[in-house]
Every structure is written in C-alpha cells, then in structure tokens.
Amino acid sequence: ENLLNLREIKAEEVMTPRNVIFAIQMDETVGDVVDKHSPIAFSRIPVYKNNLDSIIGFVHRYDLVNKQAEDQFDVKMSEILDPIHTIHETESIADILDEFVRRRQQIFHVVDKFGTTTGIITLEDAIEIQQVEAKQ
C-alpha cells in the first residue's frame, strides 16, 4: 500500500519550485559565489547557462569551500560542476527513488512537458515523503 501511494505522488508535489531555487550562473567564480552568498545553506547547488531553463549541472558546497581554502577564487562553476539528470514533473516518487539509487545521485532537475524548468528534487525530499507515507 505504501508503494502504491508513492506511485501516486508526483515530483511536482514534492519538488522545490522554480521560483525559490537557489542556483548559480555557470560563469560565476568561486570568489563571486563566496562573496555574494556566504554562508551557503545548500549542499548541492544547480548551475545554469543562460537562465533556469538551461540547468547544466550542480556544484557541491564542499567543492566551493575547498576551492576557497586553496585560494582558487577564479575557478568558474562550469569547471567544477557535476552533471545533473533531468526528470519530468509527472514522474512518481517511487520511480524517482529508484532513479536516485540507480544513478547514485542526490539531486534532479525537474521539467514540464515543454522542457521548461519547474523545480528541483533531492533524494532527501523523496525520502521524507516515503517516511511520511510509511507512518500513515
């Protein structure tokens, strides 16, 4: 029954919506990000090319901290980003959890049927929903 519920809950119900995504432009440097956004509250930060509809990857907060500690303030986000997988907003949480495990990733880019960014979803988001459903 729990798995059935997770098949009915869609990414769009759980994701962080576009209007509140904290993301970084790919040409920003470590110095730019540290100056503008410290302390950084998120462990994984989406990186985009021109706008949020062109998310090209994500950076780990610890990579930013490490580059800062090594005085590598001129390193661009495009040089340290990891690839990000894109999913459709109507995918079920059950399928998304499987995909997180299969890809060994912890953040996905969420789009609508037109490929427009609608949000991001993390493994933590999906696990929280799984735990809530298990308690019901």
Q: What are these model-derived regions, one by one?
A:
Residues 1-136:
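Soluble cytosolic regulatory domains appended to membrane proteins
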